[in-house]
Amino acid sequence: VEPILKENGIPDDFKYLMVIESNMNPTARSSAGAAGLWQFMQGTGRDYGLEVNNNVDERYHIEKATRAACRYLKDAYAKYKDWVAVAASYNAGQARIASQLAKQDVDDSLDLQLVEETARYVYRILAAKQLFNAPTTFGFRLRASDLYPPIPYTEITVTKGIADLARFARSKGINLAILKNMNPWLRETSLSNHSGRT
């Protein structure tokens, strides 16, 4: 996530927006239907280039969803020229923040009167940053053994459909459960790939 944010000129602190959106769970799903690390709704995901259908749901694809989030954040920044307003718009929507900035005639988005959830949103991002950057200050004592080790993986480019993902997984020396755990955007036991995307 961090290299993709950097590559797109998005401030590194926006990784904490992802933390509060999904608790860094790539398979997170809200009761409203938002999904993945960045909690895209289906329509917004499609608007920002993600494939969402019964076979594939790229909202669960860590890299592609992060790139889509960067496009969203850059679009919002082009409107507001203010990263705090951008963060608030991720929660409230770009149209709502734009209308409130105009209606309330304020120069600083922190001065906006917003619904409680959105008003707290930016501060939740800042709180997550503080916790991650100084855990011992808040009573968290983490040892290296408490952390998840990096998971070894092999990246494979697929440009056509796969009729049987279980057989495909076996041919790569793993099973279907591991394949789908590492690729939660795969929704079925086959991959049609009608779009020809990689």
Question: Residue locations for each model-derived region?
Answer:
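Solvent-exposed coil/turn segments that connect beta secondary-structure elements
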Residues: 22-23, 43-45, 130
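Alpha-helical scaffolds flanking conserved acidic
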Residues: 11-18, 35, 83-88
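Alpha-helix N-capping/helix-start residues
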Residues: 11-12, 42, 176
